[in-house]
Amino acid sequence: MGNTLISHGGGAPEGYNVTDAGTRVATKQVLRKYWACTNSSDTPMYLALWQVGEGGVNTSVVGEGIYLAANGGSFELNNVNMYYDEIWAIHDSAGAVKRLCVQKGQ
């Protein structure tokens, strides 16, 4: 991710407990200006960019979407590649809860 200046104001850091069934890590936010996450777990995760209204269910699938490597894999949305709908995360460690750290700006 590098050093990114968030000149439009940041939000408080957040963390999400991601399950092997999938967890929503961002809601639809039309005013989103920045969103970044880091996989702080020992297991790879996958992000699904999901459009609200496409069935109303979690669409994250292990092995598909945006890959986040274990122990620090990261992804960033900014003014170049912004996405405004829901974001889901999933991993394949059966029965385990893994941590995803998030920073957002509005």
Predicted regions and their residues:
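Surface-exposed ligand/attachment interfaces on beta-rich extracellular proteins
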Residues: L5-V30
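Tight coil/turn sites that cap or link beta-strands
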Residues: A21, G63-E64, A70-G73
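Beta-sandwich interaction modules
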Residues: A26, A69-Y84
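Short, surface-exposed beta-edge/turn micro-motifs
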Residues: L31-Y34, P44, Y84-D85
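Asparagine-centered strand-capping/turn motif at beta-strand->loop junctions
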Residues: A36-S41, H91
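Beta-strand-rich, repetitive solenoid scaffolds
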Residues: C37-T38, A48-W50, L68-A69, N78
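Short, surface-exposed beta-strand/strand-loop-strand elements in extracellular ectodomains
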Residues: S40-E64, L100-V102
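Terminal connector regions
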Residues: Y84-Q106
